[in-house]
Amino acid sequence: MMKKLLSNELVQIKRAELKEKFSKLDQKVKFAIVLIGDNASSKIYVKKKIEFAQDIGVEAKLFHFEENVDFNLLKDAFKKIDKEYDGIILQLPVLHFDVNELLLMIDKNKDLDGLNPENEKAFYENRECIIPATARAIWTFLKFHKISVENKKVFVVGQSRLVGKPISQFLKNNNAIVRVFDKSTGLKGTEEADILIVATGVAQLIKAENIKENSILIDVGFSKINNKIYGDLDIESIKEKALKYTPPIGAIGPVTVLSLFENLYEIILKKK
């Protein structure tokens, strides 16, 4: 019987630890989210991040701009935010603007997502940096569930900046045998993976023929079709073949939010 892996217990433990850590600091930590436009999914994610921040004693503030906001106004806003806040997130996706240009407006030492190009460069060169939040989340999740990647075939489907690329690098740094798949490669070969991490946003993409017997499947995909939520895994197809899997809700997502605030705490410590 395929086992469902969840993050409830992990998040509960880590949240309590973070709450205690922040309470012992000699300052009130302030965190800002910049949201441009009215993407419905982005609003949900922003709400969850603000709720988490408030729960652990971090002051949170949303800076919400219209999609057609003037670029110079944005630049001025980032300068003001940088002066007042300890950690900053630019909520993605962003339309109509060069994302790198916006990310460079965030001080690399306040960049909770680890996506500022300077942080990214350091990360891919295996230098000290802020770890991209989703990669950190997947790693934390695997460790909590005692899933070792060392010398295992850990394959990644999807090469996104947020998930696929950073987690692939993180796995290589931790002695996994990594292979990456995307639209250009197709899925042939995924069935050899001991652990398969999927992050494409294509609903029910991965079926029984794409996986190895008794493999572990980590689903970071999220799709909403006719008000129903799907991950990248076709659960009905894989349920007799996989050993363990994560659902699209209650697994990696909550740990990603947690990871942002682990990054924030480490940022504060480095400044002391």
UniProtKB/Swiss-Prot annotation:
Enzyme Commission no: 1.5.1.5, 3.5.4.9
InterPro entries listed in its UniProt record: Aminoacid_DH-like_N_sf (IPR046346), NAD(P)-bd_dom_sf (IPR036291), THF_DH/CycHdrlase (IPR000672), THF_DH/CycHdrlase_cat_dom (IPR020630), THF_DH/CycHdrlase_NAD-bd_dom (IPR020631)
Keyword annotations of the record: Amino-acid biosynthesis, Histidine biosynthesis, Hydrolase, Methionine biosynthesis, Multifunctional enzyme, NADP, One-carbon metabolism, Oxidoreductase, Purine biosynthesis
Reactions accelerated catalytically: (6R)-5,10-methylene-5,6,7,8-tetrahydrofolate + NADP(+) = (6R)-5,10-methenyltetrahydrofolate + NADPH; (6R)-5,10-methenyltetrahydrofolate + H2O = (6R)-10-formyltetrahydrofolate + H(+)
MF GO annotations: methenyltetrahydrofolate cyclohydrolase activity; methylenetetrahydrofolate dehydrogenase (NADP+) activity
SUPFAM superfamilies hit by this protein: Aminoacid dehydrogenase-like, N-terminal domain (SSF53223), NAD(P)-binding Rossmann-fold domains (SSF51735)
Sequence positions that bind NADP(+): 158-160
Keyword Oxidoreductase: yes
Domain of life: Bacteria
GO annotations of cellular component type: cytosol
Pathway named in the protein's UniProt entry: One-carbon metabolism; tetrahydrofolate interconversion
GO BP field: L-histidine biosynthetic process; methionine biosynthetic process; purine nucleotide biosynthetic process; tetrahydrofolate interconversion
UniProt cross-references to PANTHER family, sorted A to Z: C-1-TETRAHYDROFOLATE SYNTHASE, CYTOPLASMIC, C-1-TETRAHYDROFOLATE SYNTHASE, CYTOPLASMIC-RELATED
Quaternary organization: Homodimer.
Role played: Catalyzes the oxidation of 5,10-methylenetetrahydrofolate to 5,10-methenyltetrahydrofolate and then the hydrolysis of 5,10-methenyltetrahydrofolate to 10-formyltetrahydrofolate.
HAMAP family membership: THF_DHG_CYH
Family per similarity comment: Belongs to the tetrahydrofolate dehydrogenase/cyclohydrolase family.
Name used for this protein in its record: Bifunctional protein FolD
